């Protein structure tokens, strides 16, 4: 990559090649990824970009977690945690009977589809909230690799829960 100063002429082209969909800041720096980055990238305080780990194409919400990486593997319709030693967790994103879905088949691109994992926040180190289509929030347990509970707001296939955050900051 290249450094970009918005106060100067030039810079990157006005295109969305990487489809950045996650930015996270912690004590180690800034992490970001997108559908087409192929990696979870780390930005250091010296503005150097490095690869934290590789990622499959088409994932959302990738973030460092317990020395590994946690993300919505959107193409596989699962929440996936991969530890550095190769161990991890795979939990299916919930789906519903096709006949119960509203607006199914509205486009030929298959963008509006169920099981589309898009939204993730940590509740504890082992418990994760994810968003998915159609309009579903699920609470997942990485240790037992199962969905603990969830709520579906509508069966309109065109809608997916994107941004999630714990509030208050930590649950007791």
Per-range role (PLM):
Residues 27-29, 66-68, 125-127:
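Short coil/turn segments that connect the beta-strands within blades of beta-propeller domains
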Residues 25, 32-36, 71-76, 129-134:
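Conserved beta-strand positions in repeat-built beta-propeller and related beta-rich domains
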Residues 10-53, 58-62:
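Loop-centered beta-sheet repeat module
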Residues 10-16, 50-56, 92-97, 107-113, ...:
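Surface loop/turn motifs at the tips and blade-to-blade linkers of beta-strand repeat domains
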Residues 18-22, 57-67, 113-119, 156-169:
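Repeated scaffold domains used in trafficking and secretory/extracellular systems
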Residues 133-172:
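Blade-level signature of beta-propeller repeat domains, shared across WD40, Kelch, NHL, RCC1
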Residues 43-47, 83-86, 142-145:
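Short loop/turn segments that connect beta-strands within beta-propeller blades
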Residues 38-41, 77-80, 136-138:
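Structural signal for beta-propeller blades
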